[in-house]
């Protein structure tokens, strides 16, 4: 009987997510305490945010990805580059950063806008029409962020 109890405890521990990571539904990828998924659909920033908000992972409502560190930024870039369904030439995708007045805010409401990774000269609000942020992954701006028109249609990464 004690042996069966030990086996049960071992299975429960082995089946639980690793410390610092959470279980994610099929097609979602865990990183630390969140789940991430790449979508190749082309949507405006608001359409992508709404799509992510309608996605649920482990009961949590999703948002466009919020990037709080260099390590998380590299994780998202790697996830993007290794995802099926993303065309090789499509190098930009929405992240959850949007201009609000004179400052930038994450769509999930988090206040972790301490880490930034803007490309050279960005954000520049070109023609005063660039209020949403995308990740740009080619040439000199690899891993960098760019402000873009929110009506541009890009692929996107959701996080829950």
Q: Which ranges hold each PLM region?
A:
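Extracellular, disulfide-bonded carbohydrate-recognition/adhesion ectodomains
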Residues: 1-160
